[in-house]
Amino acid sequence: MRKKKNKIRVAVSGFSGLDNPEPGNAVARALRYDLGNNIDIEGLTYDVWSSGAWPSGLIDRLHLMPPLSSGDHATLNRILEINAKRPIDAIIPCLDLEVETYSRLSRQLERNGIKTLLPNQEDLDYIKKISLPYFCYKNDILTPNTIHVPDITNVAFYADQIGYPLMVKGTVADSKKVHSRENAIYEASRLNAKWGGGVLLQPFIEGDEYVVAVVCRHDNSILGMTPVRKLGINERG
């Protein structure tokens, strides 16, 4: 039986020091601001040099996690090891690559008293980068014409059809703006080698870019939303 505690204890990941793409620092600050000393925050990191975790008074402890590539079992074992010493009430995974892992582990975590609030695998499959354009079309959301090219030997053909400049995107993460067929082939080969599954091609569209962070309830209604306009764009978009 879990011992009753006065404080709640939440594990938070994503502490590279940059809010995008690792917003753990911002999440921890929000929790600390709202709950003060009534919360213990356990930081989860894949790198001991994660600078976002070190500001004084932000988190209570920092734990090194095994790489996600080690598999679900390694992640679960490490969480349960931490949980055995200091029982965790909830986990907030702040990296997009972690969401699927913790979604798959949610039932096992629940059995050990650890709560999550994550989409199920079916919903995650629905909005993967390969499937996202179809989701947008179905829900009348404007989106660039997107071509998934599973065989990168066909990249040159489809890139020429779209025209230049265009965006070459990995199936999981990462992207590159290219200005020629040669650049498209090179970047497609690089991204496919890194992420697998081919690449996505999109026309490059000028304009302001935004990141929107949303917290939803179980019924998908929005609890809170914060849009951020990107003030600077690097070569990866």
Regions found by a protein language model. Name each.
Residues M1-L117:
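ATP-binding N-terminal substructure of ATP-dependent carboxylate-amine bond-forming enzymes
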